[in-house]
């Protein structure tokens, strides 16, 4: 049980939902520069497994690390935190 709690959990925005059962999530993190103290923004894209194809473009989602599902997928969708507003 403690093993499961050590998995990485990220919150990010869905930037692509064109693949079947797969979404691309953009995760932005901030790190403080060691010498100057300025906060620098880093971003990385992760492919995540979405079994029911429920996440849509622009949604804020939570993803969790899991076993390798394909050559590039290492995360799965946990929940949709906020749905995108389509205008």
Curated annotation (Swiss-Prot):
The keyword ATP-binding does not apply. InterPro entries: NA-bd_OB-fold, Ribosomal_uS17, Ribosomal_uS17_bact/chlr, Ribosomal_uS17_CS. Pfam families: Ribosomal_S17. One of its GO terms (cellular component) is cytosolic small ribosomal subunit. GO terms for biological process: translation. Keywords: Ribonucleoprotein, Ribosomal protein, RNA-binding, rRNA-binding. Gene3D superfamilies: Nucleic acid-binding proteins (2.40.50.140). The keyword RNA-binding applies. SUPFAM superfamilies: Nucleic acid-binding proteins (SSF50249). It comes from the Bacteria. GO terms for molecular function: rRNA binding; structural constituent of ribosome. Transmembrane segments: none annotated. One of the primary rRNA binding proteins, it binds specifically to the 5'-end of 16S ribosomal RNA. Part of the 30S ribosomal subunit. Belongs to the universal ribosomal protein uS17 family. NCBIfam families: PRK05610.1, uS17_bact. This is Small ribosomal subunit protein uS17. It comes from Bacillus anthracis. The gene is rpsQ.
């Amino acid at each position: 049980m403690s093993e499961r709690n050590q998995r990485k959990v990220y919150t990010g925005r869905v930037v692509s939902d064109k693949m079947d059962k797969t979404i691309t999530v953009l995760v932005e993190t901030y790190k403080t520069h060691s010498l100057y103290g300025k906060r620098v923004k880093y971003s990385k894209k992760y492919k995540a497994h979405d079994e029911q194809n429920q996440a849509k473009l622009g949604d804020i989602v939570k993803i969790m690390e899991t076993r390798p599902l394909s050559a590039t997928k290492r995360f799965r969708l946990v929940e949709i935190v906020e749905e995108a507003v389509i205008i």
